Amino acid sequence: GTPCKCHGYIGVYWFMLAGCPNGYGYNLSCPYFLGICCVDR
């Protein structure tokens, strides 16, 4: 996916998702335009 910033961390932008997908170890997320930014810090 596309890199994105969330709370000072670099995360992955997921298009058209309301929540982070399971199985990736994400524990931080930020709402983005038409999607969500997920970080596994």
Curated annotation (Swiss-Prot):
Covalent S-S links between cysteines: 4-37, 6-30, 20-38
Major place of residence: secreted
Superkingdom classification of source: Eukaryota
Keywords, sorted A to Z: Disulfide bond, Ion channel impairing toxin, Nematocyst, Proton-gated sodium channel impairing toxin, Secreted, Toxin
GO cellular component term, pick one: nematocyst
Compartments where found: Secreted; Nematocyst
GO molecular-function term, one example from the UniProt record: ion channel inhibitor activity
Keyword Nucleotidyltransferase among UniProt keywords: no
Entry annotated with the keyword Transferase: no
Further details from the record: A synonymy between H.magnifica and R.crispa is controversial.
Function comment: Weakly inhibits human homomeric ASIC3 (IC(50)=5.5 uM).
Protein family according to the UniProt entry: Belongs to the sea anemone type 3 (BDS) potassium channel toxin family.
Protein's UniProt name: Pi-stichotoxin-Hcr5a
